[in-house]
Amino acid sequence: MGHTLAEKIIMKHIGGKDVKPGDLVVVEPDCVVVHDIYTAFLRDKMKKMGLTKVWNTDKIVIMHDHLMPACLEGDPRSLEAGYELVKEYGIRHFHAAGGIVHQLVPELGYSKPGDIVFVTDSHTPTYGAVGCFSTGVGYTEMAAVWGTGQMWLRVPSSIKIQIDGVLPPHVYAKDIILRVLGDLGAAGGTYKSLEFCGTAIDALGIDGRMTIANMVVECGGKAGLFAADQKCADYCGVDYEDVAWVKADEDAEYERVLTYKAEDLEPVLSCPPYVDNVHPLSEVKGVRLDQVFIGSCTNGRLEDLKIAANVMKGKKISSHVKCIVTPASNSIMEEAMKEVQMVVEGVYSAKAARSLAKKYNVSMPIVEEVNQVLFE
């Protein structure tokens, strides 16, 4: 019997031993990341556990992204804890205000095809876009990994999602994952590995795959995985021949299989009050909008900004609508400045960022450059 992609990655990390869904295994991750929401909690837990050193300073990353710039009274304590962890434990990889953690981890090369990565955040499955088994953990588990280099896993069962064909115009990766969420339900993927394949999936770029993998947690997914291909290898800077094994076996056994014709998909929206309340755009046409947000760890990449810019080109945002744009990382903002003109009346992005940066004395040179171009 063959194995799913999740099973093959886990097997690689336990010496090739055969596994099946439900098995409990202990793995050493290739990388672990903690962000600023949990640095103070992690530091306290490390002290309570009596951990005075970490297992591998090359495999531990701290990122400040959620609380930059600090807005609430308790935020500075969390940021300070991050710097203290760097000093106390000799952490070698530290990033502050460079972007959203789920963009930076693959962008900076901390996730590779066939890796296992843990992060203190629910949307960690994002890195499955590059064939990495990645999932979120709490700060207690993270403290244990820091000290021991080990984490237990229950091998997940897998759901195969196959989409073949060519996507219609104006149907994107977000429409794919929302359709899947609507079909599975908000709990339909609980502790499952959602594994995406098919010609329509193969045609997606890494940006689109990240959007899909990022959202599998919205149906309870443990991981969202894509097979490694040449696009993936090029993005990660690895030789494809070295990662060609990062794919499911043809005779892999799945708990469930969902199949779609790409041509049948259409633009959809996730409507209140639940993420699986998904409706075709045509059904909600005419609903008044008060605020539009373009960005986040789900849709803040260059491909997303290009699509949004093309939609808004030549148009004016209504006076009652606030439109906010937040690129997922500084490098994406820099690329967007070169390739995408987001000069649309009523858009709040760099202007608001400069005000916050000035208030909290945070240096953001790229924001200053954007403001000079757009507003001065």
PLM features: residue spans?
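Fe-S-dependent hydro-lyases/dehydratases of central metabolism
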Residues: 1-338
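NAD(P)-dependent Rossmann-like dehydrogenase/reductase catalytic/cofactor-binding core
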Residues: 334-376
